[in-house]
A protein has these predicted regions:
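DNA-binding alpha-helical recognition surfaces that contact promoter or target DNA
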Residues: 6, 20, 31, 45
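Alpha-helix boundary/N-cap detector
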Residues: 38, 42, 95-98
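Helix-turn-helix/homeodomain-like alpha-helical modules used for DNA recognition
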Residues: 55-135
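DNA major-groove recognition helix of helix-turn-helix/homeodomain DNA-binding modules
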Residues: 15, 23, 41-57
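Short glycine-/small-residue-rich flexible loop motifs, especially phosphate/cofactor-binding loops
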Residues: 5, 16, 105
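A short, Lys/Arg-rich alpha-helix, primarily the initiator
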Residues: 1-11
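Recognition helix of helix-turn-helix/homeodomain-like DNA-binding domains
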Residues: 22-39
Length: 135
């Protein structure tokens, strides 16, 4: 176990995806993860930046859930639309579906209500969010 491997796991990335994020060959990422080579500070910083983004988005999402519950009453559950592929995850500001899922896991773990995950655009609320400017 190395810091690179631990941070990649926390970020929801495979080693292949972590290598892509850091702009290196996949075998370099594998060597950093196994400790055969030390990951440079820039690679660790990129993972930390992604994790900070995941935490920021999760915190904002939870704040929105709480605000809506206070305004309209707590629902039995909430629905969150998930990206179907990496391209869609990238349109949401995440490098891949796994990174989005790591953010969503933080929301699910801390949400005061049950969370249901559905494909983005498959129901009325997610479809409106997909169509909204800036989404």
């Amino acid at each position: 176990m190395t810091p690179f491997a631990a941070l990649s796991t926390l970020a929801g990335l495979t080693l292949h995806e972590a290598g892509d994020l850091c702009g290196v060959r996949h075998d370099s990422a594998r060597q950093w993860a196994t400790g055969r080579r030390t990951a440079p500070p820039g690679a660790i910083d990129r993972l930390r930046d992604l994790i900070a983004t995941q935490e920021r988005v999760a915190t904002q999402t939870l704040a929105q859930i709480v605000a809506l519950a206070q305004q309209h009453g707590a629902p039995a559950e909430i629905e969150i639309g998930y990206p179907a592929d990496d391209y869609e995850a990238q349109s949401l500001g995440f490098p891949c579906v796994g990174a989005w899922a790591a953010m969503a896991a933080r929301v699910i773990a801390a949400a005061p209500v049950s969370v249901v995950l559905t494909p983005r655009g498959s129901t009325v609320a997610p479809a409106a969010a997909v169509a909204a400017p800036g989404s």
